């Protein structure tokens, strides 16, 4: 079984305070995108995991946690072999590890024909990581609580395109949250549409990653002719640009946009939704422009 394991963006992320357990409460808009990894699953004589990034061939890989959670719930112990082809950078803030974990849960459910509904898979996903339940939604959702409570959201941003800018150095989630100050918190809004397209974690991350702050300012200047918006996803280190798809109707503007993407080494992506089953695999995962 070969499944696409997509990345996600946080189109906005607002922090509201801390829980009694020390976790940060938030409201965030998630969007799954057509860029990601591939995960292969097959029966085997013993459990194994092989990844094209050797540093992920460890017991700490969340795929192993998914397998354990699935086994605890179903009592199925048959050994399986995994192969993971990574494209999503480590520590990028676009849900690479969480997506792999969710994809693994879905794959196990299909492989062993256990017919667990999405509601159960979401609950199992919460035991693995805060972002994992997202991937059992349609791909467009609002996250509340600590981000793990998923609410459906129809606005899938098909009228926008996104350009990803990865960093050579990732950001650890624990570091991003450790620099948060009380003045970084935002008030809750009654209507989701009232939230500005901002990521409150930028304030904390930029305190120890000035290079990302400088990169954001550079991207804002570069993309200003196209009325584009620049934001950090999750805890970083990925920055992304969003711009109106309708701009590409004009051939000259479309040409200028694609030249900007190529010159800045961005990765052009689109929103991705599923209507049933799992997320479809895009035709071309390697091109920087499509």
Swiss-Prot record:
GO terms for molecular function: 4-(cytidine 5'-diphospho)-2-C-methyl-D-erythritol kinase activity; ATP binding. The active site is at 8, 131. Pathway: Isoprenoid biosynthesis; isopentenyl diphosphate biosynthesis via DXP pathway; isopentenyl diphosphate from 1-deoxy-D-xylulose 5-phosphate: step 3/6. Its EC number is 2.7.1.148. The keyword Nucleotide-binding applies. It comes from the Bacteria. It catalyses: 4-CDP-2-C-methyl-D-erythritol + ATP = 4-CDP-2-C-methyl-D-erythritol 2-phosphate + ADP + H(+). Coiled coil: none annotated. Catalyzes the phosphorylation of the position 2 hydroxy group of 4-diphosphocytidyl-2C-methyl-D-erythritol. This is 4-diphosphocytidyl-2-C-methyl-D-erythritol kinase. It comes from Chlamydia felis (strain Fe/C-56). The gene is ispE.
